[in-house]
Amino acid sequence: MMRRTTFREIKNTFGRFAAIMAIIALGVGFFSGLKMTKPDMMNTISNFLDKGNFYDLHLLSTLGYTDDDVDSFAGEKDVLYAEGGYSLDVLYKNQGENDRVLKTMSVPENINKLSLVDGRMPEKEDECVVDAKMDSIKIGDVIEVADDDAAEGEDSSTQDILKVKKFTVVGTVNSPLYINFERGTTTLGNGKIAGFVYVSPEAFDSECYTDVYVKFDREFDLYADEYENYIDDRKDEWESICKTSVLDRYKDILMAKGMTEDMVKDITLDDADGVNYYILGRETNIGYVCFESDSDIVNGVAKVFPVFFILVAVLVCMTTMNRMVEEQRSMIGMLKALGYGKAAIMGKYMIYSGTAAVVGCAGGYLIGTYVFPEVIWYAYHMMYIHMPLERTTDWTLVIGVLAASLLCTVGTTWFSCRYELSETAASLMRPKAPKPGKRVFLEHIPFIWKRLKFLRKVSVRNVFRYKKRFFMMIIGISGCTALLLTGFGINDSISGFADNQYGEIQVGDGVITLNTSIAGDREDERFSSLKDRLEEDTSCYDLVSESTWDLVHDGGVKSVNMVIMEEPEHVDRYMKFADKDGAEIEYPGKGEAVINTALAEQYDLKTGDVITVRDSEMKEIRVSVSGIFRNHVYNYVYISPETYEDQMGEAPQYKSVYFNLEEGADSHEISADLMGDAATASVTINKDMKNRISKMMESLNYIVIVVILSAGALAFIVLYNLTNINITERIREIATIKVLGFFKNETSDYVFRENRVLTTFGIAVGLVLGVFLHAFVIGQIKVDMVAFDTYIAPMSYVY
């Protein structure tokens, strides 16, 4: 019988049952979905990189590496694979299309293996596979090396390196080297690489490899600190290995030119002008680095927002079950009078609530962990390669959300039943005595109370007399309002983010990184050729010392960009120093530093505080903070040349150039021209950084939309549930009012007037809570690359 009455109860109160189920499902789905998004994204990229044997070290040398070098590297400690390859930038023409620069590489065998998207791999020298993100080149197209592919300043043209000048596209691929949309810059064409091409190694004609990739036999989790420490140790070891290899190669070249063994035996790399080698880790791969930052942003939202979301859902569920048991007093009393034990009676209501919890939790988890990661991953397709999301299952999370769902429903039901069952059957079968009348606060203010009409006085009394109902409505509505405001606030904080950073704060057009340090001397012969190009191509330029230092303060260490302007009075050409209120900040004087807001907030720094910055050789500079400027991207410490020289005993080494372009100038054409100079190591165009940040923010917009829609759905279900409870528990009161002759609209107004008052209260409280919740959530979205403003637009309060 009890089983039958339980199912009958579910059938008769299916609206309430469905509401509980929906709240649980929405809360669990949102919480679990966002929580599982980063693990799923990480698992997908990790599996892709593992299948492709993504490199651990990338070795470069101006002399290249031979097969003997590669064989030697393969025998070193912990090495699983060492593989040489060819890569160069090539200007192609494509059947009447505009010429474009494509990174052309040899198909790898063991490291950075390609993932075939469509077609097949090259089988002949004149076949190639292309970047799957390049929609303009199709399978079957023929791409041909352009005649004017050699850029000024290059020692040899691609005509000499590539044996084959025309390739037929036979497939499209994804490469572990290019997991996001960035393809890099070049000295050719318009200065931008449009995509990549892989051809057979036999298509190259070179006696040495341009690149060597090394894969170690140790496995670590993606982005793990243990991996970073391991690679740092390996890099130190490989310094001597590469130095020996490059020196031997240099001596072989000299001997091939006629020098004897005795003549070259004492030569060192310091004697070799223009000979350099580089040992690069994954941190130089833009896609790899950006993915960590992007996934951290997702995790920042998922860290706190879903917790508040599920708390609101849990609270409403607990209230609903508590009110339901109170409504069922007569039924509980009757069952008790019929001889049913406490366990049997409790079981009926616990099965009711438990069924709603289990079904809602299961449905919410399955739908949430599918929909939320899928939607967010789809958004990231704008920035990253297309691949199916590979999901993971976190059984700890499954057990946790199920336990929380049961606790807030079954647990509440148990406590409520236990309280009701403590009374006698006769007492339970009688309706609960109404609460004694009390004067409410407004009755003590005659000026207001006397002016209220009778029905409004009744509504005011009811609002404040039934405190459970009051707090239930206030907490439920304010919680949903706070969640909605937070969602809109996140959108306000990220919209216009890139335009603000690269339009109002960083106003320079680009940065050149020099091959050789120029100690503040513009007349240095190493700088003279680049200076001519700069004076022709730019409207202004300034030498800058920009390097990575560690800020050491209060037991913490943070990597920062140390910037020293050669001519500090020119800083406003490239950077606008202003605090959060917009007040201008002066460039720091001797013994002073200006830092960005994110650093100041992280270490609780104020103007006048003393900080220490330390370089890689453990040399330190102590400075007083003279200003804190608004900045969103990266962390900066600005000091004066005098400060550096005073504390380090030498002039700064200026290895960067900030520049601005003339109005309407093509930044990428000028970038290509500047890259053609021997003194230039790289050119960064701020417009490209702006586009990269904008794409990151566009992806985050999808998360915001999901958050707002979910919060809106929760608000709807909560309001439905609370209104349903409010009306159901007042059936007798409504009947009495109708008997007294109230019209239908007056009866409705009597009930809903209270709802409107409580809803207004709840919204007001929710807007205040939303400000704090938004600030808290934004504070949790912390990544090394970006920092967001805590800003809510006025219209968001209206929405």
Region annotations inferred by a language model:
Residues M1-G29, M350, K438-G479, N726, ...:
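N-terminal Sec/SRP start-transfer signal
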Residues M2-L311, R323, K342, F497, ...:
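Membrane transport/envelope proteins' first extracytoplasmic loop
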Residues T5-G15, L315-T355, N701, I705, ...:
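Interfacial "coupling" helices/loops that link adjacent transmembrane helices in transporter permeases
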Residues N12-D40, G354, A362, K468-S493, ...:
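Short, strongly hydrophobic transmembrane alpha-helices
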Residues V314, M318-E326, S330, G354-H386, ...:
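Small-residue-rich transmembrane alpha-helices
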Residues L421-V440:
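Short cytosolic juxtamembrane segments of multi-pass membrane proteins
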Residues F454-K590, T597-A598, D609:
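Juxtamembrane segments of multi-pass membrane proteins
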Residues K655-V657, S671-G779, V783, A787-T790:
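C-terminal transmembrane helical bundles of large multi-pass transporters
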